[in-house]
Amino acid sequence: MTMTLDAARGGEMVESPFLAQLVAVIRAEDSHGLWDDKTNSEILREFIVTAEERRSMPIIGDPDPELIWRMTKFYDAIGLLVEKRTGCMASQMQKMHHEGFGRVVLIAGKLVVVSKHLRDVHRFGFETWAKLAEAGEKLVESAVATINEFPEAARA
């Protein structure tokens, strides 16, 4: 699975453990092999929202089910990468209002390792592949640091 270039959307594709994990999480959902011929950039295409696309979106809007699914996969990938790096399973829980605001938490043992308030979820996306990778890696690194600071709670 190589990351391919998709210059029209998202700029140059970057090599990232987070993007590789996100692709793996999404491909795991494909039980019938419909996405086997798609490149990784095609799989992740909907995570890219250009500045022009974001400007055309309404200020207030309801998120559609596909967008909520993508957001869930984003946080699932974070949880799995945290588990790979620490050995502690990190599961997500989210509460989302139909108008696009809510909260997501990742919990390892008895420890909250990620806590993020969400708003304007209908605009969820990243301008470039690099920003998508950076956002995921930043949350993973923060969660790993929290687990390393409180290992007893994370392993409880």
UniProtKB/Swiss-Prot annotation:
GO BP of this protein: nitrogen fixation
InterPro entries documented for this protein: NifX-assoc_nitrogen_fix
Keywords in alphabetical order: Nitrogen fixation
Domain of life: Bacteria
Family listed: Belongs to the UPF0460 family.
Protein's UniProt name: UPF0460 protein in nifX 3'region
Organism listed in the record: Rhodobacter capsulatus (Rhodopseudomonas capsulata)
Taxonomy of the source species: Bacteria, Pseudomonadati, Pseudomonadota, Alphaproteobacteria, Rhodobacterales
